[in-house]
């Protein structure tokens, strides 16, 4: 099990809110149903006309605006986008219908990875994002029927939580080994010809096929220099997740034909088997299949055959018990602590209430994603660590021993306790974790200030699941 959480294929790198899945809104469902019928009727020759339909474009525009995101290489942001479309859309639409539209290069953005290195995103212009979203809405219903029930990423009505629950079920059934496969630089290594071959089996409109090929080959701009692309589907645009699922459906079908129990979320694939020997055989044979049939390479360093509780999948792991329980992987806690540390930088001049207000969305969103956890001890420990950090901020803000003693007395300590604590010559971190600060500023104090409790949030969310 490898990833920290479901990887965001967009301008934001990793958002816990994605666990909500991709369920269609009422308006989108109506449009999608109508487009599905029309697309199926016209996919032989008129699919681009469906893409450019007013209702489809309106829905795509709403999606792009809601997702916000950074500007592309043209520098046009959300605020200017509407006026830009009013001026240029008639020409753009005419080029799309004529099969002559040329996408602009994507803007390179490097996102640091937790363990070093970077994830490369390619941010399209808002115009290209709109067109890709319109394409996605029409193509998705055409290909969705072919996707595997064991594929959970970037699909309507499916999400990371379903994948994690399925993984737990497989282990509970006795598959106590996992083949954790890491596809080496998957989004950078997608073979264009192979992907286009798969697309052409379902899409008859050559204008659509040419446009997708142009998006795949659109250059990437960094430092004012555009680099051509001969492989890969850059993360950052609405079309990339769908294209990855289309290509990796070949892997899903191969695993199904062999009778394997597996979960795939985008390029994260875990296969569950009953013995280490079986796992080693599966690892070797599937690695050959990926290389021979899909032109993809398994990262031998990051991949492994192991016990499920030794790996992590979408930020979760499992306990070793006969009836395993879901737990939050240690690396996921580390990621949260790093985000909290970043949020608490430069807080000396701010009130504690302001700091807590900025911290709460991080804590609330993180726990919303990890609400499936069935172990609470570490959640309690992280709660305590957050309060420790906030007490440390108070201690540092007070600066002088007499100020500290005065504030400790205001918080209820006796004069003797307050002065002994304030003048103990220990450091801020030691004092903020000591008994005098815990008595003066207990959990109830932070509750009154509105600090989100991870444990309380977990219990509340689990009650409504």
Label for each model-derived stretch:
Residues 1-465:
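Non-catalytic terminal/accessory segments
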